[in-house]
From Swiss-Prot:
Pathway involvement of the protein, from the record: Amino-acid biosynthesis; L-lysine biosynthesis via DAP pathway; DL-2,6-diaminopimelate from LL-2,6-diaminopimelate: step 1/1
GO terms, biological process: lysine biosynthetic process via diaminopimelate
Main localization, broad class: cytoplasm
Gene Ontology annotations for the cellular component aspect, listed alphabetically: cytosol
Protein name as annotated: Diaminopimelate epimerase
Record's keyword terms, sorted: Amino-acid biosynthesis, Cytoplasm, Isomerase, Lysine biosynthesis
Protein source organism: Mycobacterium avium (strain 104)
Site for Could be important to modulate the pK values of the two catalytic cysteine residues, residues: 169, 221
A GO term for molecular function: diaminopimelate epimerase activity
Assembly, per entry: Homodimer.
Length: 294
């Protein structure tokens, strides 16, 4: 079984090219593949297929709204094996892989996801690196029903803004938090939040106030833990930072441990632009894969 390994600002993925959607991706198999000691190691797995093939194979119950059968489809799994609606860094790496492998020749095309269609623009790409923009759709802030959204991260309580970017986020901007304090925060430790507000869990971002157009962010992703970057999380962070500044739209650089991305928020949608790197290509032992499914 062939694979590729890539990352977007060090949010890393194993890509499995499975255009007929025939692979059996169990939670156990995905978790083993993502394990950094007994597998290849990754924050998640990207199955490369089309929406029509995924629906025909039963991977999808139905085509997501706005996604056509002949659109590419990113079947994304978190490192614990759970299915995720969307991954902004993953879409960039997915699009880069399509171009680098010759499966796609266009500069602009659609990548489908459970969260819907994500139009991409490949500004530049070669076998190793790419610069990709993704139309992430409109990021919607969520009401709290009169109860504040809060999370505890690294033993510290933060107020946050709930943002839907195709998946749920709690973006916690602390105007008093310094870059050094953010770097010292234990984001890898389990986070706590009101499960009644987020019954399906939530991705939690902690960020500084913007300075010279730059926001510093760290993230604890549901189903994964701390990652070096989270594409949808950077969009949520940009929305929170703009909202705190009294703005509805704007462009910010979001600096995560894995690098920088640029997020633009408009009245109608949001855009995420950043790098992708393809690191390796290889083959997974069929015997190991079968054992990992158990």
């Amino acid at each position: 079984m062939k694979f590729a390994k890539g990352h977007g600002t060090e949010n890393d993925f194993v890509l499995l090219c499975d255009t007929p959607a025939e692979l059996r991706l169990t939670a156990a198999g995905v978790a083993a593949l993502c394990d950094r000691r007994r597998g290849l190691g990754a924050d998640g797995v990207l199955r490369v297929t089309t929406a029509g093939a995924a629906a025909a194979a039963g991977v999808l119950d139905r085509l997501p709204d706005g996604v056509a059968g002949d659109d590419w489809y990113m079947d994304y799994r978190n490192s614990d094996g759970s299915v995720a609606q969307m991954c902004g860094n993953g879409v960039r790496v997915f699009a880069h892989y399509l171009r680098a492998s010759g499966l796609e020749t266009r500069d602009e095309f659609v990548v489908g996801s459970l969260a819907g269609p994500r139009p991409v623009t490949v500004h530049a790409a070669d076998a190793t690196g790419a610069d990709v923009s993704v139309d992430m759709g409109k990021a919607n802030t969520l009401g709290s029903g009169g109860k504040a959204f809060e999370a505890t991260v690294g033993g510290r309580r933060f107020a946050g803004l709930a943002v839907d970017v195709g998946n749920p986020h709690l973006a916690c901007l602390d105007p008093e938090l310094s870059v050094d304090e953010l770097a010292a925060l234990d984001v890898a430790a389990p986070v706590s939040f009101d499960a009644a507000q987020f019954p399906d869990g939530v991705n939690v971002e902690v960020l500084t106030a913007p300075a010279a157009g730059v926001v510093h962010m760290r993230v604890h992703e549901r189903g994964v833990g701390e990652t070096r970057s989270c594409g949808t999380g950077t969009v949520a962070a940009a929305v929170a930072a703009l909202t705190a500044a009294g703005a509805d739209t704007g462009t910010l650089t979001v600096r995560v441990p894995g690098g920088d991305v640029v997020v633009t928020v408009t009245d109608a949608t949001s855009y995420l632009r950043g790098p992708s790197v393809l690191v390796a290509h290889g083959e997974i032992s069929e015997e190991w894969w079968q054992q990992a499914q158990r």
